Regions:
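Carbohydrate-active catalytic/glycan-binding domains of CAZyme proteins
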Residues: 1-154
Protein backbone atom coordinates (compact mmCIF):
# COMPACT_ATOMS: atom_id res chain seq x y z
CA UNK A 1 0.00 0.00 0.00
CA UNK A 2 1.32 3.43 -0.97
CA UNK A 3 1.29 6.20 1.62
CA UNK A 4 1.84 9.90 1.05
CA UNK A 5 5.19 10.82 2.60
CA UNK A 6 5.44 14.47 1.60
CA UNK A 7 4.16 17.01 -0.91
CA UNK A 8 7.25 18.43 -2.61
CA UNK A 9 5.55 21.32 -4.43
CA UNK A 10 2.20 22.99 -3.97
CA UNK A 11 -0.01 24.64 -6.57
CA UNK A 12 1.80 22.92 -9.44
CA UNK A 13 0.14 20.73 -12.07
CA UNK A 14 2.98 18.47 -13.21
CA UNK A 15 3.17 15.48 -15.54
CA UNK A 16 5.84 12.81 -15.95
CA UNK A 17 8.22 14.05 -13.22
CA UNK A 18 11.70 12.61 -13.55
CA UNK A 19 14.37 12.74 -10.83
CA UNK A 20 18.10 12.81 -11.51
CA UNK A 21 20.95 12.81 -8.97
CA UNK A 22 23.78 14.65 -10.72
CA UNK A 23 26.69 16.88 -9.77
CA UNK A 24 25.81 17.12 -6.07
CA UNK A 25 22.19 18.13 -6.69
CA UNK A 26 18.83 16.49 -7.24
CA UNK A 27 17.16 17.62 -10.44
CA UNK A 28 13.43 17.34 -11.11
CA UNK A 29 12.29 17.50 -14.73
CA UNK A 30 8.52 17.91 -15.20
CA UNK A 31 5.96 19.03 -17.73
CA UNK A 32 4.03 21.85 -16.10
CA UNK A 33 0.60 23.20 -17.02
CA UNK A 34 0.73 26.89 -16.19
CA UNK A 35 -2.76 27.75 -17.46
CA UNK A 36 -5.91 25.62 -17.06
CA UNK A 37 -6.69 23.72 -20.24
CA UNK A 38 -3.21 24.21 -21.71
CA UNK A 39 -1.29 21.28 -23.17
CA UNK A 40 1.15 19.38 -20.96
CA UNK A 41 3.18 18.26 -24.00
CA UNK A 42 4.71 21.60 -24.97
CA UNK A 43 7.03 22.75 -22.19
CA UNK A 44 9.53 21.08 -19.89
CA UNK A 45 10.51 22.70 -16.60
CA UNK A 46 13.49 21.97 -14.36
CA UNK A 47 13.93 22.35 -10.60
CA UNK A 48 16.83 21.54 -8.27
CA UNK A 49 17.29 20.77 -4.57
CA UNK A 50 19.82 19.26 -2.20
CA UNK A 51 17.66 16.23 -1.35
CA UNK A 52 14.96 14.37 -3.28
CA UNK A 53 12.42 14.80 -0.46
CA UNK A 54 13.07 18.53 -0.09
CA UNK A 55 10.13 20.92 0.00
CA UNK A 56 12.39 23.72 -1.23
CA UNK A 57 12.79 22.97 -4.96
CA UNK A 58 14.33 25.91 -6.81
CA UNK A 59 13.11 26.69 -10.34
CA UNK A 60 15.83 26.67 -12.97
CA UNK A 61 16.85 30.07 -14.35
CA UNK A 62 16.08 28.94 -17.94
CA UNK A 63 12.52 27.65 -17.32
CA UNK A 64 10.93 26.40 -19.40
CA UNK A 65 14.09 24.59 -20.51
CA UNK A 66 12.33 23.08 -23.55
CA UNK A 67 9.46 24.64 -25.52
CA UNK A 68 8.87 22.17 -28.34
CA UNK A 69 6.06 19.61 -28.65
CA UNK A 70 8.54 17.27 -30.41
CA UNK A 71 10.78 16.91 -27.37
CA UNK A 72 9.34 18.54 -24.23
CA UNK A 73 7.34 15.64 -22.77
CA UNK A 74 9.44 13.23 -20.72
CA UNK A 75 9.46 9.60 -21.83
CA UNK A 76 11.36 7.76 -19.11
CA UNK A 77 14.32 7.83 -16.77
CA UNK A 78 17.36 9.91 -17.67
CA UNK A 79 20.25 7.52 -18.21
CA UNK A 80 24.01 7.62 -18.59
CA UNK A 81 25.92 5.88 -21.35
CA UNK A 82 29.60 6.29 -22.20
CA UNK A 83 29.86 9.21 -19.76
CA UNK A 84 26.98 11.15 -21.32
CA UNK A 85 23.48 11.85 -19.98
CA UNK A 86 20.45 11.11 -22.14
CA UNK A 87 16.86 12.25 -21.60
CA UNK A 88 14.16 10.24 -23.39
CA UNK A 89 11.47 12.55 -24.76
CA UNK A 90 8.17 12.02 -26.56
CA UNK A 91 7.44 13.49 -29.95
CA UNK A 92 3.80 14.50 -29.54
CA UNK A 93 3.65 16.68 -32.67
CA UNK A 94 1.25 14.41 -34.54
CA UNK A 95 -0.22 12.33 -31.76
CA UNK A 96 0.73 11.19 -28.28
CA UNK A 97 3.89 9.08 -28.53
CA UNK A 98 4.39 9.53 -32.26
CA UNK A 99 8.09 8.82 -31.71
CA UNK A 100 10.83 9.03 -29.09
CA UNK A 101 13.62 11.57 -29.18
CA UNK A 102 16.76 10.71 -27.23
CA UNK A 103 18.15 14.03 -26.05
CA UNK A 104 21.80 14.28 -25.01
CA UNK A 105 22.09 16.65 -22.05
CA UNK A 106 25.10 18.80 -22.87
CA UNK A 107 24.96 21.34 -20.03
CA UNK A 108 23.22 21.01 -16.66
CA UNK A 109 23.96 23.59 -13.97
CA UNK A 110 21.81 25.77 -11.72
CA UNK A 111 21.92 28.56 -14.32
CA UNK A 112 22.39 26.77 -17.67
CA UNK A 113 20.75 23.93 -19.57
CA UNK A 114 21.41 22.65 -23.06
CA UNK A 115 20.51 19.47 -24.90
CA UNK A 116 20.59 18.16 -28.47
CA UNK A 117 18.80 15.34 -30.23
CA UNK A 118 21.09 12.30 -30.34
CA UNK A 119 18.62 9.80 -31.83
CA UNK A 120 15.02 9.25 -32.82
CA UNK A 121 13.03 6.05 -32.38
CA UNK A 122 9.94 5.71 -34.55
CA UNK A 123 7.51 2.82 -34.03
CA UNK A 124 8.17 1.36 -37.47
CA UNK A 125 9.45 -2.11 -36.55
CA UNK A 126 5.92 -3.56 -36.72
CA UNK A 127 2.85 -2.33 -38.64
CA UNK A 128 0.68 -2.98 -35.56
CA UNK A 129 2.60 -0.51 -33.38
CA UNK A 130 0.92 2.91 -33.36
CA UNK A 131 2.92 4.79 -30.72
CA UNK A 132 6.02 4.52 -28.58
CA UNK A 133 6.07 6.76 -25.53
CA UNK A 134 8.38 5.37 -22.84
CA UNK A 135 11.97 4.20 -22.78
CA UNK A 136 13.44 3.29 -19.40
CA UNK A 137 16.77 1.71 -18.65
CA UNK A 138 18.08 0.21 -15.42
CA UNK A 139 21.35 -1.67 -15.64
CA UNK A 140 21.10 -4.25 -18.40
CA UNK A 141 17.31 -3.97 -18.59
CA UNK A 142 15.59 -1.70 -21.11
CA UNK A 143 11.79 -1.31 -21.26
CA UNK A 144 9.82 0.30 -24.08
CA UNK A 145 6.12 1.10 -23.75
CA UNK A 146 4.12 0.94 -26.98
CA UNK A 147 0.51 1.18 -28.11
CA UNK A 148 -0.75 -1.46 -30.51
CA UNK A 149 -3.42 -1.12 -33.15
CA UNK A 150 -5.77 -3.97 -32.28
CA UNK A 151 -8.70 -3.97 -34.61
CA UNK A 152 -11.56 -6.22 -33.69
CA UNK A 153 -13.50 -8.07 -36.33
CA UNK A 154 -17.20 -8.15 -35.53
Amino acid sequence: KWELHRTLMRDVVAFDPTLLNYSGRWWLFANIVENPGASYNDELFLFWAGEPTSCDWQPHDCNPIVSDVRRARSAGRIFSQDGKLYRPAQDCSGEYGQALAIQEIQTLTETQYAEREAAEIKPTWSPKIKCVHTLSQAGDLTAIDIRLDRRKVL
